[in-house]
């Protein structure tokens, strides 16, 4: 999936560049991230692969892994508008866990994807 240009962004020391996302139904979970965040998804395998919207992170949706829920490390995805993103989350089978709250000049919130994973989204600047 990654091309030569994105490989130079992915294969760099000390950068987070690969995620394994638990997914009881990998096809449904992959469709969620594709619809909500515009990730590039490859569904032609039992554990669909993805590349995020920046080309810095790749990974797989893992069918036999259990979602951590609210425990464990929680990745946060940067978005332009948290409110619009949360609307998309709900429309595509996810749910809001915590409402958006300010942290300095940021707005931060968490959601649960269709597989039960809890992740966060955040935006910089005013929430309008």
Segments and roles (model prediction):
Residues 29-33, 89, 116:
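Conserved active-site tyrosine of GNAT-family acetyltransferases
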Residues 45-47, 103-107:
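Short acidic/glycine-enriched loop/turn segments that link adjacent beta-strands
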Residues 1-28, 56-57, 73-75, 124-128:
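N-terminal beta-strand motif that seeds the catalytic metal site of vicinal oxygen chelate
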Residues 36-37, 92, 114:
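Structural motif
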Residues 38-73, 118-124:
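Conserved short beta-strand elements that form part of the metal-binding/catalytic scaffold
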Residues 16-24, 66-91, 107-112:
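Vicinal oxygen chelate
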Residues 40, 93-97:
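A common structural junction motif
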Residues 25-40:
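Amphipathic alpha-helical segments
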């Amino acid at each position: 999936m990654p091309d030569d240009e994105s490989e130079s962004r992915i294969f760099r020391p000390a950068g987070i560049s690969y995620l394994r996302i638990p997914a009881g139904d990998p096809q449904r979970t992959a469709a969620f991230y594709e619809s909500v965040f515009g990730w590039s998804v490859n569904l032609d395998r039992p554990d669909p692969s993805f590349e995020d919207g920046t080309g810095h992170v790749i990974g797989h949706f893992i069918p036999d892994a259990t979602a951590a829920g609210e425990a464990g490390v929680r990745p946060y995805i940067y978005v332009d508008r948290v409110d619009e993103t949360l609307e998309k989350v709900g429309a595509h089978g996810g749910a809001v866990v915590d409402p958006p709250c300010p942290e300095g000049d940021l707005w931060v919130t968490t959601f649960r994807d269709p597989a039960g994973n809890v992740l966060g989204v955040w935006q910089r600047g005013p929430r309008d």
